Amino acid sequence: MDRKQLANAIRALSMDGVQKANSGHPGAPMGMADIAEVLWRGHLNHNPSNPEWADRDRFVLSNGHGSMLIYSLLHLSGYELSIDDLKNFRQLHSKTPGHPEYGYAPGIETTTGPLGQGITNAVGMAMAEKALAAQFNKEGHDIVDHFTYVFMGDGCLMEGISHEACSLAGTLGLGKLIAFWDDNGISIDGHVEGWFSDDTPKRFEAYGWHVIPAVDGHNAEAINAAIEAAKADPRPTLICTKTIIGFGSPNKSGSHDCHGAPLGAEEIAATRKELGWEHGPFEIPQEVYAEWSAKEAGAAKEAAWNEKFAAYEAAYPELAAEFKRRVNGELPAQWEEKANQIIADLQANPANIASRKASQNALEAFGKMLPEFMGGSADLAPSNLTMWSGSKSLEASDFSGNYIHYGVREFGMTAIMNGIALHGGFVPYGATFLMFMEYARNAMRMAALMKVQNIQVYTHDSIGLGEDGPTHQPVEQIASLRLTPNMSTWRPCDQVESAVAWKLAIERKDGPSALIFSRQNLAQQPRSAEQVADIAKGGYILKDSDGKPELILIATGSEVELAVKAAEQLTAEGKKVRVVSMPATDTFDKQDAAYREAVLPSDVTARIAIEAGIADFWYKYVGFDGRIIGMTTFGESAPADQLFEMFGFTVENVVNTAKELLA
């Protein structure tokens, strides 16, 4: 069969899907159909009957607006994505949302749409493949050996994150990463020459990539030769494919008119004629399905791999068991028992240390149990304290380590970690100053949306960092993280809460965790075993009154000690004061109503929240009758103790505010 007709099946489904939805992007799928046909039918190792096969090649559509391309590919090659699913493109509760979403249709490796993040996720996947191979493969036993392929457009390359990710990919020699640039010269505003005139091949050569320029994106032989050359080269490869957006559309191809709008019934009819595609909307002939189906070949490839793995298992039974545990995302045996013992030991041996140091101590204790840890920092390891005694850096020539030097690339780091998490086999953690989570925010949002494990260590969490001033002092960042759905945000007050936060982040497989730590030393709080257990509920009574409280002080992180001291003074003056430590508001909010009422009785309306972050967040806990000691402006450059005094974070101010409230 003429392979052009196999590519035309993608074009037909794409224009039909967009037309039926009356919205979407037909241009990119029609332009990249020939490349997709060559890659998916000739090179991609995958099994539609088992989309979770551990050693499958990964495919990422970074230009996610062209989602009908991947939906068409999944449908045609035999995944559980029916023609009715394609007809439901962009409709409520369909498996085919406007941009590809992880967890909806089988075979979607990552959620894409925010441009540049797909290529960055792909870099993470390629890093995970190379690291797993270095950790598990033995001579004659290559059980981890697959490619990561990514399609991307001009928009991805204009986004700054593509520089962060592709620069690092070149440095680390990710030879199993192959990217296709859809060089069609068109974006939403029109022809890109006016705003995107980079010499992209030279740019990628400068990163240390293997670049194959000027490939005709509509010539199957040229595309195939480029892929073969890419697979043979030890460097990551950029294949520059010259394509015509909306290929086949007589009146709209090559222009922005077909980028982000349906072609219209008349133009679709003309396109069918132009392409020689004589079938109705959503009609695919049986012989086309037969040519496209990857079920038989995919099952054979997985069966061959299963044989390889059985031989590996016979030769290296312990490694094989560990590989299975890690790719299944299971924690080691005795994890719960050992982790709880570590936490109990910390409570029994008080230390007044910065919570960033407590975080490093937790890494040291837990890391010995977790070979799946893949740590890192955006060039702040000595400040974030993310390296521990077992940390070994990844290098291009040796990927057997467990620590990535991301360089000053906060956004790139976070989206790469999403790719590592999606690939499987690792628990990634990264780090920067809390202030600079702003650079990475959208990648954390994507982790929350995809429900993937991404642990971020955010240190230097308030005006407490002092002299560096307001450019580096976070104010609104904690609230911003807490307001993100499916984000778990922790701001611990001492080494015990810090270890609990780490334990829960390691156990949390269905979303990201933001662990927020101080630069300055924090006093350890005394607790009973029951109180230690209650930390995991996100908020608990740390210090209680004799009898029913008349005032509740709610605090987090460095301000918990302040609340305790103020409570002691108020108690000495005859007031009944309860102190609630609330390291994780989202976790507290998930507790049952009875527990929340026990901690914050609704009839005790005299409440003060104390946190060196934006004040407004706390009204939901203190009510309009309560008071908040927090930040309402940016900080200043000065020693931390002077700043805490200036902004009202003193025992005296808490006591005076309490007296006013109780008067």
From Swiss-Prot:
Record: residues binding thiamine diphosphate: 65, 113-115, 155, 184, 259, 436
Matches recorded under InterPro entries: THDP-binding, Transketo_C/PFOR_II, Transketolase-like_C_2, Transketolase-like_Pyr-bd, Transketolase_bac-like, Transketolase_BS, Transketolase_CS, Transketolase_fam
Coiled coil: none
Textual note on the cofactor: Binds 1 Mg(2+) ion per subunit. Can also utilize other divalent metal cations, such as Ca(2+), Mn(2+) and Co(2+).
Entry's EC annotation: 2.2.1.1
Gene Ontology cellular component annotations, sorted alphabetically: cytosol
Keywords: Calcium, Magnesium, Metal-binding, Thiamine pyrophosphate, Transferase
CDD domains xrefs: TPP_PYR_DXS_TK_like, TPP_TK
Catalytic residue list: 410
Family the UniProt entry places it in: Belongs to the transketolase family.
Record's protein name: Transketolase 2
Taxon lineage: Bacteria, Pseudomonadati, Pseudomonadota, Gammaproteobacteria, Vibrionales
Gene coding for it: tkt2
